[in-house]
């Protein structure tokens, strides 16, 4: 069922560069001057799906906007600087993407980012709740396992919460799983689709290799190694960059892919499926990432976990306590805010 609905990875990105796509989405990027924000803004500017691109950050946005505005594509670009300009950046937006926050450095986990990024996400999502309450909210800022509950609680506080419109962008886990499986099996990565469920940190990242299309088989030792590599791929990049940042280019690609899928669905395209960390009843965890059928109003249907192998079943059971703790941490943060 899922395999039939899921289009091959990257199809949305490729299609977004074709001229036949509808061209009307108003998209805001909050944290547009950062390591993810700049390449993400470039990919969004390059897409005919986007008609207006508004960029927000606390530094350098006028320069980033000026640079992007010289690109010969239809999207208009405007930069907004500092909290007093944030309301204007958000007005009339259909989609808001938030990569704002501090990146990981060697030796740090995504959870180490919590104290700084929790405040940033709470502040930015409060502005979204006030100035574009109907927009789709796509959170990239880590730790996603906590920043999505933060976003939900902030929207609840403002009385505008809609669980079908708040997404934790876990797409990079799927992109990596597709790339790594394709590499091992000598397949075209654009034709590989591996659902990745659970959360977006370490052991909570659960690639469902048993549901991969096309079907692939690995001996258990290779499967364990592959799963571990997908779970720790972010750390692999942090180490390789040796203190000069985290995964920015691949994250920008994954973020753009998710936005284009969402906009396609909002434009009425049928059968658009992406995994995302959202409010969920699929497990006893209040938030969980699974494949979602996207529609005009956000989540049309949660497609659930589906049939999993005993190895995957065990990973799900082990991930849930950690996920619950991260979720609670996010919820408590908002409850304790002044």
From Swiss-Prot:
Enzyme activity is enhanced by acetylation. It catalyses: (S)-malate + NAD(+) = oxaloacetate + NADH + H(+). The active site is at 200 (proton acceptor). Keywords: Acetylation, Glycoprotein, Mitochondrion, NAD, Oxidoreductase, Phosphoprotein, Transit peptide, Tricarboxylic acid cycle. Substrate binds at residues 104, 110, 142, 176. The modification Phosphoserine is found at residues 246, 326. Homodimer. This is Malate dehydrogenase, mitochondrial. It comes from Bos taurus.
């Amino acid at each position: 069922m899922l395999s039939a609905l899921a289009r091959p990875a990257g199809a949305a990105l490729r299609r977004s560069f074709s001229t036949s796509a509808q061209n009307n989405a108003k998209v805001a990027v909050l944290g547009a001057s950062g390591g993810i924000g700049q390449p993400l803004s470039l990919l969004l500017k390059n897409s005919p799906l986007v008609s207006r691109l508004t960029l927000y950050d606390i530094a350098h946005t006028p320069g980033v906007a000026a640079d992007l505005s010289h690109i010969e594509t239809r999207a208009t670009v405007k930069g907004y600087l500092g909290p007093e300009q944030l309301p204007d950046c958000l007005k009339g937006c259909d989609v808001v993407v938030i990569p704002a926050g501090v990146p990981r450095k060697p030796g740090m986990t995504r959870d180490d980012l919590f104290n700084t990024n929790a405040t940033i996400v709470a502040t930015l999502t409060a502005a979204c709740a006030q100035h574009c309450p109907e927009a789709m909210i796509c959170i990239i800022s880590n730790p996603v396992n906590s920043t999505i509950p933060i976003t939900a609680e902030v929207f609840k506080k403002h009385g505008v919460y809609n669980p079908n419109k708040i997404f934790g962008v876990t797409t990079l886990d799927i992109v990596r799983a597709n790339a790594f499986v394709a590499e091992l099996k000598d397949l075209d990565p654009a034709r590989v689709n591996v659902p990745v469920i659970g959360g977006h940190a370490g052991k909570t990242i659960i690639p469902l290799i048993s549901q991969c299309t096309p079907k692939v088989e690995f001996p258990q030792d290779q499967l364990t190694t592959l799963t571990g590599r997908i779970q720790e791929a972010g750390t692999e990049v942090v180490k390789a960059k040796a203190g000069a940042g985290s995964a920015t280019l691949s994250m920008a690609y994954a973020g753009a892919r998710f936005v284009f899928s969402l906009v396609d669905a909002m434009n009425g395209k049928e059968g658009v499926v992406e995994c995302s960390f959202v409010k969920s009843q699929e497990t006893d965890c209040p938030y969980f990432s699974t494949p979602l059928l996207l529609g005009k109003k956000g989540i049309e249907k949660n497609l659930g976990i589906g049939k999993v192998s005993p190895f995957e079943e065990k990973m799900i059971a082990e991930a849930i306590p950690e996920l619950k703790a991260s979720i609670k941490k996010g919820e408590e943060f908002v409850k304790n805010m002044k």
